[in-house]
């Protein structure tokens, strides 16, 4: 009997330690989750340099988050987010719906690459939309006994100081770089009572693609001045 009691105490201690580590080391969990599950959302490689998250304050920071380019495109990566600041309500970290007060993304660098009849960002956005749809279907199945995915409500998301490089295979690795207008999104998931992480990512990706398209169409003269010799026709092809 004593051996069983000792064994039970040891098991409880191990479980307790696991729960403690899981809660205290959210930074490790988030980094692994981004790099392991991220490719299933974006359809590309995902890498993150460093993650810092405090479960007590709810403040977090991601550095050097990189989204790879889809197959068939030549640029090294589609996007790099050097600095991402998070502010989460710590009381909701273990809740079914996590309340994110703010997300700030400073100085991202994005590559807008044309390939055939589409662009790399459109390919990534479609992958995110498809994953978001599957997540929604899985969430709706929760009433049938399937565990629901955690959802998020994001009060404010701000992307500022971004740069976009527009290129294509015809430009042989070179392109035209221009400023990305600031993007501000509010109340993501509020109307729906929360959205999954992939749904939130899809909303943000579509907002970025739309803003880039708007910027391209309103700055044709700027684009004509850049690139390599003979690249005007290639640049025209990017905005068709």
Regions found by a protein language model. Name each.
Residues 64-187, 191-240:
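Secondary-structure transition motifs
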